[in-house]
Design a protein with these regions (language model features):
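Low-complexity, flexible helical/coil segments
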Residues: 70-73, 78-82, 113-114, 123-130
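Beta-strand-connecting loop/turn residues
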Residues: 39, 84, 110-111
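Outer-membrane beta-barrel domain signature
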Residues: 37, 43-51, 124-125, 130-131
Length: 131
């Protein structure tokens, strides 16, 4: 089996972005999060659409999982890369919630950025369906 070094590099870069995402969420570091999102990114959950700017304000003003002594239990569930686009599925336990995030990333000018975040709290429902 042969590997493609470009895909391996992309995979490593995306993993690094996701690790930054996890750390930023855990520590409430909005500057760290802002650096990995495209400025026009939208964050969406059922009934809740926010701009990146609004979400970062929310992150800055809430308590952090780290300050509350909560465990760092974030997990990458999958990464799919097709040329200059990627979709990442994550587990993000935060506070009393258990979020599943889908992050859409695009690679432009050799740099990956998160352009879209969709998330839902599966702690409130048992509606998890895979096809």
């Amino acid at each position: 089996m042969t590997t493609n070094p470009a895909i391996d590099d992309d995979f490593t870069m995306i993993q690094s972005i996701i690790n930054t995402y996890f750390t930023g969420l855990y520590q409430g570091n909005s500057d760290q999060l802002k650096a990995i999102f495209h400025p026009t990114a939208m964050l969406k959950s059922p009934g809740n659409f926010r701009s990146l700017e609004r979400w970062l304000e929310d992150v800055e003003t809430r308590a952090t999982p780290k300050s509350l002594g909560q465990p760092f239990n974030f997990k990458i569930l999958s990464i799919e890369i097709i040329q200059d686009q990627a979709m990442v599925k994550l587990e993000c336990p935060l506070f009393d919630h258990f979020y599943i995030d889908f992050l859409g990333l695009l690679k432009e000018q050799s740099r990956w950025l998160i352009v879209n975040k969709m998330y839902t709290d599966i702690a409130q429902t048992s509606d998890v369906t895979a096809v």
